[in-house]
Amino acid sequence: MLVIFLGILGLLANQVLGLPTQAGGHLRSTDNPPQEELGYWCTYMESCKFCWACAHGICKNKVNMSMPLIIENSYLTSCEVSRWYNQCTYSEGNGHYHVMDCSDPVPHNRPHRLLMKIYEKEDL
């Protein structure tokens, strides 16, 4: 009975968070998550390269339009994300992992914001 309840709760959490339920709600490790999930992944780890569109060294956030334009630098991280049941994981590719409960997410942006270089017109 408890297993059925937890399963239903997991499906409801996926619907509330906008995470699709394909393949049992699992997402294999990828550096290119589905477009419809970018809003979720890029909210909690905004320094992932897949969250930004870059051209000529200037980058714009694909999800959060209030983010400033930035200069492409070490702030952007090659991330891989995965989801197994209700555990969401970000891998930064350098042995650092951020693991969180998908239905109770915790942002992991602060350590990376220290490296962000905001684009100024004078930078051209």
Swiss-Prot record:
Any one Pfam family match given in the protein's UniProt record, by short name: v110
Signal peptide segment: 1-18
Induction remarks: Expressed in the early phase of the viral replicative cycle.
Any Gene Ontology CC annotation: host cell endoplasmic reticulum-Golgi intermediate compartment
Annotated localization: Virion; Host endoplasmic reticulum-Golgi intermediate compartment
InterPro entries linked: ASFV_fam_110 (IPR004848)
Motif (Prevents secretion from ER): 121-124
Record's keyword terms, sorted: Early protein, Glycoprotein, Signal, Virion
Presence of keyword Phosphoprotein: no
Tree of life domain: Viruses
Glycosylation: residue positions: N64
Tagged with keyword ATP-binding: no
Family to which the UniProt record says this protein belongs: Belongs to the asfivirus MGF 110 family.
Function: Causes the redistribution of lumenal ER protein to an enlarged ERGIC compartment.
Descriptive protein name: Protein MGF 110-4L-B
Species of provenance: African swine fever virus (isolate Portugal/Lis 57/1957) (ASFV)
